[in-house]
């Protein structure tokens, strides 16, 4: 793929490209695997000096596919796609990445999408993951350079994800609030997490959307990305998610997985500098629970 930039100050090409998230590894790939660097239309080395107003163009060679991923057909719900990014509305019940004896995963489904459309880059790059039984928006990069640029936004916490959750308990919630509590591995499990002073800093904010008595619908924003963060934080408040029996959630409301849905995803497209905002409607199982709660409340 070819990208073009205009130089703002005097430096060497490699230093200029570093400012545009071209890593040493990617620069080596350009040099040794068939890529190119041009300055004002002339091919040059990475050490070539450039000056204000010069135009630097690069061609990044195509990537070899992951040998571990299998292209598995699946009717993907594609929310958005361009040359750099793919946004999928993930159904619950599917993990993000494969594991032993579990091939029906979003990574393999996206791999099939890339292969069946004969995309030049067929390596799958997951930018934002979701747990197996969480539904909603997932962001994929369609090549390594796009992934590197989005990793920078992840580090800067400028990718914004909002979740809807149904929680249950007697704890009163304010109209909006913050949960700041460190999360650590559970001493008795390699899977579960807990709030503990030995854990890593974790910050969750929420807004109360609807109150059905013991059950509440909340809109949640993560400021950190700890494993099971939403599930652990709300269980810590005495408000576990419906269907989340791993953290004490009730199975009495007809939802068979944790009631958690990523409904909004916002980020800055690093290539166009435009804000990208994508939305996803609630799933049918979520809607059914809410409808039943509203009926009982009325």
Regions found by a protein language model. Give the residues of each.
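RNA pseudouridine synthases
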Residues: 1-298
């Amino acid at each position: 793929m070819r990208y073009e930039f205009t130089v703002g100050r005097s430096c060497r090409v490699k230093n200029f490209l570093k400012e545009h998230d071209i890593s040493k590894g990617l620069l080596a790939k350009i040099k040794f695997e068939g890529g190119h660097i041009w300055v004002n239309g002339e091919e040059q080395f990475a050490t070539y000096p450039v000056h204000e107003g010069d135009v630097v163009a690069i061609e990044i060679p195509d990537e070899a596919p992951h040998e571990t991923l299998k292209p598995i057909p699946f009717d993907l719900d594609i929310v958005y796609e361009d040359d750099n990014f793919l946004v999928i509305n993930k159904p619950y019940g599917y993990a993000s990445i494969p594991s032993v004896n579990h091939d029906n995963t979003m990574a393999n489904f996206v791999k099939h999408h890339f292969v069946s459309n004969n995309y030049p880059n067929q390596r799958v790059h997951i930018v934002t993951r979701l747990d197996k039984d969480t539904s909603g928006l997932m962001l994929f990069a369609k090549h390594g350079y796009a992934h590197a640029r989005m990793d920078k936004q992840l580090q800067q916490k400028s990718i914004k994800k909002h979740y809807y959750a149904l929680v249950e308990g007697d704890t009163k919630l304010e109209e909006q609030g913050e949960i700041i509590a460190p999360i650590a591995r559970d001493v008795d499990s390699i899977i579960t997490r807990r709030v503990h002073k030995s854990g890593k800093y974790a910050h969750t904010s929420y807004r109360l959307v609807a109150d059905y008595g013991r059950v509440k619908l909340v809109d949640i924003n993560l400021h950190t990305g700890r494993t099971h963060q939403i599930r652990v934080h709300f269980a810590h408040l005495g408000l576990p998610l419906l269907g989340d029996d791993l953290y004490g959630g009730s199975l009495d409301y007809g939802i068979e997985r944790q009631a958690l849905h990523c409904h909004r995803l916002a980020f800055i497209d690093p290539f166009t500098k435009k804000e990208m905002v994508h939305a996803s409607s609630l799933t049918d199982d979520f809607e059914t629970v809410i409808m039943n709660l509203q009926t009982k409340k009325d």
